[in-house]
Amino acid sequence: MAKIIAFDEKARRGLEGGMNQLADAVKVTLGPKGRNVVLEKKWGAPTITNDGVSIAKEIELEDPYEKIGAELVKEVAKKTDDVAGDGTTTATVLAQALVKEGLRNVAAGANPMALKRGIEKAVEAVSGALLEQAKDVETKEQIASTASISAADTQIGELIAEAMDKVGKEGVITVEEFQTFGLELELTEGMGFDKGYISAYFATDMERMEASLDDPYILIANSKIGNVKDLLPLLEKVMQSGKPLLIIAEDVEGEALSTLVVNKIRGTFKSVAVKAPGFGDRRKAMLGDIAILTGGEVISEEVGLKLENAGLDLLGRARKVVITKDETTIVDGAGDTDQVNGRVAQIRAEIENSDSDYDREKLQERLANVAGGVAVIKAGAATEVELKERKERKHRIEDAVRNAKAAVEEGIVAGGGVALLQASQVFEKLELTGDEATGANAVKLALEAPLKQIPSTAVSRAAWSWRRCATSPWATA
């Protein structure tokens, strides 16, 4: 396929045009009086939403340069959604304003690398100022309030606060679609770890880029799996059972990985491979935790177990496993309760006997994983109309969970763009010169953009609001 190549101003303007088209469609939803956007669907009724990342995902542009520009802003919205669960529209507005000011200065002859250094120094200073402003979120009521705002639903906020209260602030909370009305909270045995699928081809939900396995077998191996001949006997047994397979191993590569991916794409066999969490002895211990929670065995030659000889009796089981690119959550493992309790007691004893702060911290993480369990929020619907939109409701709850966890970790600040504007006062302390100072000034101007956008969507007096918020002491979080 022939490539279209552009340089300098033509390339920059093409990228900016795509960014502006996407950002202009998204930013009208900002604020308490933000507008809704109607999204056409290939089939069925159109979707009405004010969720920034949902709008961004739907935008596809014809011009190749504009398409690249739009994709860059999509990535901004998506990363914000993944980390914080909210604030995607604000992030889009900031990105648009920063790019606009940056390109204006580049066109005027500024050095792009010096601008970049100035932007990075300014962003670091602003991040520090925002953290200083932040109020801690500690009580159940504060968590419920934060999650309620994100989900635009008080009941969802209270349920998330209840879930965090039961499994701890570092605990695993997962959301499942439920075939009935309303919301329900269930606490089950299970765990999560920070390793995702090895290949994106394993994803079963391409929109969310996650894989979901119902009632799977779980192979736990403390070694690399590369030779498909070693894996084939076990694969045939699992395929005969009609169940999906989750493979947790040091690595899955070569023929073995290719075979799993090809069978998944063809629809012959549903499986997901993930790398084992941790390293060295810690990995061995965490694999042992997973084995006990799921009722399986760790396949390792150290204990005389070889992959080619493994049967279904050595595999773990769970009611459900959800895997994203970054993490794996095992829900309701089939492990024996007495063995799980014994493992908890063993880890607690190791914590008491440990002299190393680092080791103690890692043991505490393992203890939380094994003993804390998994909180499952079952998302039904309040009405028959909502029942048709259950998937969107599930995504909204997942975003609210991430939002609540981010608030607990780093605190909350004044909303409405006020905190960003007040954080810009930190620029008075930055001692930058030349194009680095110009880059920092671009950040300062971008920080004003969200607060200027909110009144414009509400058809209000933007200039008056901006001046008052910049100077009002009550606006400080």
Curated annotation (Swiss-Prot):
GO terms for cellular component: cytoplasm. PROSITE patterns: CHAPERONINS_CPN60. Keywords: ATP-binding, Chaperone, Cytoplasm, Isomerase, Nucleotide-binding. Pfam families: Cpn60_TCP1. Forms a cylinder of 14 subunits composed of two heptameric rings stacked back-to-back. Interacts with the co-chaperonin GroES. Belongs to the chaperonin (HSP60) family. NCBIfam families: GroEL, PRK00013.1, PRK12849.1, PRK12850.1, PRK12851.1. This is Chaperonin GroEL 2. It comes from Streptomyces lividans. The gene is groEL2.
